[in-house]
């Protein structure tokens, strides 16, 4: 009789573990992006269509913008702070991200690419 409760306990623990793994699979991927001196690093990121992702934005100098019309992103990146933007890309393609907050003489060249596959 003791075997049946032990089996039931092991089965319920196993179901809990597999359920926990499924929940972790749905957690957004995190991509770190740094804005500094007229550039974003990295210059290009690749995302998967239909998979949630958090873009973790940080500035190492002044206030910057992070604007991507196709992905409906318009964020401000303040120095010393982290700005998280979570999206789920719905269309494949390449989007250019620009800094839309004037940050100095090289501001017009501050761009990066997001590629959704």
Where are these regions (language model features)?
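N-terminal post-signal-peptidase region of extra-cytosolic proteins
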Residues: 35-43, 68-72, 80-84, 97-98
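Positively charged n-region of N-terminal signal peptides that target proteins for export
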Residues: 1-6
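Extracellular/periplasmic metallocenter environments
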Residues: 19, 78-117
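N-terminal, post-signal-peptide region of Sec/Tat-exported proteins
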Residues: 45-81
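N-terminal edge beta-strand
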Residues: 25-52
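Boundary at the C-terminal end of the N-terminal hydrophobic targeting segment
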Residues: 20-24
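Bacterial N-terminal signal peptides
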Residues: 7-16
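A mature extracytoplasmic/lumenal domain signature
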Residues: 37, 51, 58-61, 70-72, ...
